[in-house]
């Protein structure tokens, strides 16, 4: 079934093997799958974009600071950026701009692809699925799947692969690497999991979502004397932070915050 245009929905049957635009069942499946992929790539990549923007606001003594300067310098060198003699925050702001350019640059492919083994890079190149600008791949996916455009499943799946790479080797890579720069690179740590981590006598705050920028600040503030005293003045014994989903992993790896879920 295809519901992409307002003349639909078109349901493919033995008597009606093509939709109003001429697309068959294979093309419709390809279109739907590509749109799913584009939605996921946009979601994760926007998480990465938010981290890149936050990096641009980091400053000495500010709410957001560079917690892993060595990693920032290492990434800068990987991207061919001069680091010698630069203030770490000037470098952070420069890298923030370069990272955001990955979302809309007008030519070239993702900088991060060079991290892959050479034979993998060659495979991507030969298959024609090297991602270009991150936002371009999402836009291209929506263009290709609109009524009257691509209905060849091979082309649609190829663009889905390119979208997936633009996320995993683009937006998500930005999110992962620059989160470590801002909040510290995780190390092995012991914590707890499941609903038993909640405390009936405390104020319970559960952080949830993709972006650690907010959850890190919640953890920071909740641990302050001012907030703990306020919770006690309201009748609680303290504040318990726990997490679910991706953000839970972020604060668990860096702070040992327990997980209210089971993964």
Where are these regions (language model features)?
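Metallocofactor- and cofactor-centric catalytic cores in central/energy metabolism, strongly enriched
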Residues: 1-263
